[in-house]
Amino acid sequence: MQEGTDPYGEIEISFGYQCNNKKIGIPEDKIADGREVLGGFRLQKTSSFSCLSGAALSGNPTLANTNICNGVIGSEILPSLDSPKSFRKVPSSPALSKLDILSPSLHGSMVSLSCSSSTSPSPPEPESCYLTSMSSPSSVNEGFLLSAMEVQVAGGAAGEDRVQAVCSEENGWLFCAIYDGFNGRDAADFLACTLYESIVFHLQLLDRQMKQTKSDDDGEKLELLSNISNVDYSSTDLFRQGVLDCLNRALFQAETDFLRMVEQEMEERPDLVSVGSCVLVTLLVGKDLYVLNLGDSRAVLATYNGNKKLQAVQLTEDHTVDNEVEEARLLSEHLDDPKIVIGGKIKGKLKVTRALGVGYLKKEKLNDALMGILRVRNLLSPPYVSVEPSMRVHKITESDHFVIVASDGLFDFFSNEEAIGLVHSFVSSNPSGDPAKFLLERLVAKAAARAGFTLEELTNVPAGRRRRYHDDVTIMVITLGTDQRTSKASTFV
């Protein structure tokens, strides 16, 4: 990407990924003794994506990193993870591991995962939040996704949003996450520096469990570890369910640890009780696309139907009061509360029905930390906001073209069908272009027209005031298949 002035704003962050057209994985005889990739699952497969394009546009001011947890997150961890210009290799001793905020519940999770089947976990009991150097238990192989030979990371902040992408082409997987923060970016920052590592840790535990377990399913005996070099277990239903459970456990753990941190620091920062974040995670492992979401960010698949026409398939659920299913769930869970939805928001405060954080709508003690009109009256039966995610796994087929992963700001202006139509049209005529940046350009043009501005007038409106015309918008486009093309990704702030 050329440096210089951009008509849609100043481009401060630019990253993108282009897959090589080669076999993914390395031969077993080339792996040193004791070397494990993808937690022991030695994948010999071709990547099911060809490139990644991403972009983010700020409507809110992009503030300094959070100062929670004694400032360690904002001053040490996030700077080591953010890569504003390109994907870069994960350092051998990532600063990410300096945050041992998850240690107590990680040890509990290790015990429960080793002794239980693949069932949805309950949130772990809150433990004390503390910071120290992190070291995984010796019984779990250190490294996993972080130690794969070609793991690369990119990400950054735009307004209250955070975007994160981690890729290992050699193992054929891609992790993408959008944390759409609200009432501040503390929760989004917390997720950016903890959730990926927590997912990695739980996947290590899954590997350990599968190595110790023998399963008899439909009469077929699977020796899960005695012959692992000859079997790709990432394609088994047992593994798929295990991955979904890992994502679920990691999210519950993040919620527990974040709210514990809020309780510890709310005396000095009472605003933390209202801070929250939507969560959208996609994990592409070989041909399987795992999706987890809380809130109203979306993953939308563009796929060809039987008539060879491109159609949009939403892989996520919209967790808002506008969703009749969600509203009905809320009402059924709080039968004794006649005033749940006020003015189209939960207790008149929040439109999303599921999110991480936002403790004042979950615990009476946290609501009491707020003063005056900020405090929610008649908090009769909390929690009113759920942390139970929607999850699914989609098997990538030859009919699947690309996936749009985006915060709700995109869908304030475009329907799912309009978004995939714009991307398809752009990529068809600009095979080496940047579809995510193009979507943002179209969004800004539409926002300007809607407000009665010229494009230049809108882009000259400073962040903060620009929030009147569009939200923070984060977009990633994952191009599926093995077509070779050049991609870029941009963050506008």
From Swiss-Prot:
PROSITE patterns given in the database record: PPM_2 (PS51746)
Cofactors: Mg(2+); Mn(2+)
UniProt keyword annotation of Acyltransferase present: no
Record field: catalytic activity: O-phospho-L-seryl-[protein] + H2O = L-seryl-[protein] + phosphate; O-phospho-L-threonyl-[protein] + H2O = L-threonyl-[protein] + phosphate
Cofactor note: Binds 2 magnesium or manganese ions per subunit.
Domain PPM-type phosphatase positions: 145-480
Name recorded for this polypeptide: Probable protein phosphatase 2C 40
Organism: Arabidopsis thaliana
